[in-house]
Design a protein with these regions (language model features):
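Active-site-adjacent loops and short helices of periplasmic peptidoglycan-processing enzymes
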Residues: 25-217, 221-230
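Domain-terminus/edge residues, biased toward the C-terminal soluble/receptor-binding domains
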Residues: 197, 208-317
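Boundary at the C-terminal end of the N-terminal hydrophobic targeting segment
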Residues: 20-24
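N-terminal secretory signal peptides that target proteins for export/translocation
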Residues: 1-3
Length: 317
């Protein structure tokens, strides 16, 4: 009988200890919290985020504290009325989209990117350039520089890329090669070196002349080379420029690229228009981890809207 009482007492002590242990375990993991996952088996959402390193990129900002959300990207490539379009990755040259990219067309002032590239690669941008009378024989867009005036090469280059004056293009070209014809040959040689083999240039400004042509694909190749040039990139992104004439007068030049003011992601490049070429534009844009170049040729006045839409689509596709 005494043995039975001892056994009952031991059983009660064991049951009490077991109950206490279970309560302590429940206190460690409150009710409603799921069992922890194994370390080598993360939740599906975590694994998905790890495959998209840009998923948490901050929104672009135009001013401190003024954030611009990424544009929504849905559906296919934005429709445009342009005759030719070429979109490439500025770093790799990979084609992102093309439309009649090999169609031979006049390039208008977009070919001034090649003019600027040759001038920049030649160097000596702090050297003086003296304007000659033949430089001023260009219409219709002019800066009205005067024969005999002297400017630094870099100042003329900035004006060329921001406001696109044709007299400045002639001045830089003649100063570089000795004549417009010699500079045009330099343009064709440099284009071939870059791989733009379906183009032929006759003048440095893009005004219409027989035998001058390019294509959206070739211009994207030239634009990539220009985009890789730090001097050119530092200029084409300027929304405006104060140009100081030789007589001391200052003129504010507004960038002809309206996409710079429409899109916070745009950082250049070059506009163009003639009646034969239509509205043309090469524009570049970037976000963290991505740089693209869009070439639009033979468009209407909708070129700004079209290029902005293509730029956003290409950056956030």
């Amino acid at each position: 009988m005494k043995l039975g009482r001892n056994w009952i007492a031991c059983f009660c002590v064991f049951a009490f200890a077991l109950t206490t242990f279970a309560q302590e375990q429940e206190a460690v993991r409150p009710s409603g919290v799921p069992e922890p996952l194994a370390k080598d088996s993360p939740p599906k959402a975590t694994r998905a985020r790890s495959r998209h390193p840009h998923a948490k990129i901050k929104a672009a900002s135009t001013e401190e504290g003024d954030q611009v959300s990424p544009p929504p990207v849905s559906g296919g490539v934005p429709a445009t009325g342009a005759r030719s379009v070429m979109m490439v990755d500025a770093r790799t040259g990979k084609t992102l989209y093309e439309k009649n990219a090999d169609e031979i067309r006049p390039a208008a002032s977009t070919q001034k990117l090649l003019t600027a590239l040759i001038i920049t690669e030649h160097g000596f941008l702090d050297q003086p350039v003296r304007v000659e009378f033949s430089d001023t024989l260009a219409e219709p867009v002019k800066l009205n520089i005067k024969p005999g005036d002297t400017y630094q090469r870099i100042d003329l280059l900035r004006a060329l890329l921001v406001k696109s004056p044709n007299d400045v293009a002639r001045c830089l070209a003649r100063d570089n090669a000795g004549s417009i014809e010699a500079f045009a040959e330099a343009m064709n040689q440099r284009a071939r070196e870059l791989g733009a083999t379906h183009s032929h240039f006759v003048n440095p400004n893009g005004l219409p002349v027989p035998g001058q042509y390019s294509s959206a694909r070739d211009l994207s190749i030239i634009a990539r080379a220009a985009y890789a040039n730090p001097t050119i990139r530092s200029i084409v992104c300027l929304p405006q420029l104060a140009f100081r004439y030789a007589n001391g007068r200052t003129r504010e030049l507004e960038n002809t690229n309206k996409v710079l003011r429409r899109s916070p992601y745009c950082n250049g490049m070059k506009t163009g228009y003639t009646e034969a070429a239509g509205h043309c534009l090469i524009c570049s844009g970037s976000r963290p981890g991505r740089d693209i170049i869009v070439v639009v040729l033979g468009d209407s006045t909708a070129v700004w809207r079209d290029a902005s839409a293509l730029l956003s689509w290409g950056l956030w596709m």
